[in-house]
Amino acid sequence: MLIEEIFSSKGKVKILRVLSEREELNISAIVKKTGLNHSTINTHLKKLCELGIIEEKKFGRIRIFRLRKEDPRGFAILNLFNTFKGVEKIER
């Protein structure tokens, strides 16, 4: 897997950023926080799950997603967004 696959679209980056800020989110919360439509989010979430970057849990009809921080790639993504969050605060 190439890093380009993970960061191949602004939509995926928005989803990963939101998931790095929260422990777990359902699709409705991701839609609200990213401004992306439900269909686009579903497509990106499916791909990110296939890549092993995020994990899906199902509770009946509810689907919850989280960044897999125990995976080295997920941990690196979390650190990347945390680093940029710190830089953004300094630049303000």
Language-model features: locations:
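Short, Lys/Arg-rich nucleic-acid/phosphate-binding segment
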Residues: K58-I64, E70
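Short capping segments at the starts of secondary-structure elements
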Residues: R22-N26
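Key DNA-contact positions within bacterial/archaeal DNA-binding proteins
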Residues: S39
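Residues within the DNA-recognition helix of helix-turn-helix
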Residues: H44
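A short, conserved structural fragment
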Residues: C49-F59
